[in-house]
Amino acid sequence: MITKQEKLIPKKEFTNITKRIQRFISQSKVKKGICLIYTKHTTACIRLLEPEKLLKQDMHDFLERLAPSSCKYRHDDLEHRTVPPEERRNGYSHLRAMLLNHQETIPIINGKLDLGKWQRIFYIECDLGKEDRTFNILILEGIK
């Protein structure tokens, strides 16, 4: 098992991390196995998407309809929650992340991610404004 934690400061909602992951796989010299990419943040996700600008806008709009940022959420009632005073009002972000997924598992074949023609790995930040985010890469090497 080979692991690495990557740092990220998301400047946008969708960040393509495919090249970073493939670079790590190439450096590991693993030819056959499984790559697990995950985040430990409750308002961030890892998903396979087509890297098309309008599709990403459609996804943003879809998530906004399901969990509007303008709605009132109990999570945001800081008077009734026991949280630090600097806690963010981000109930919508948690709900959006819950609808997505915090990890993806992709086969490694001949030292490369076995992705479909249009598939790319995206880090999705549901709570923009956060800094120093991370995602983890775990490689399980197959039988040689």
Each language-model region and where it sits:
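Active-site histidine-anchored catalytic micro-motif
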Residues: M1-K144
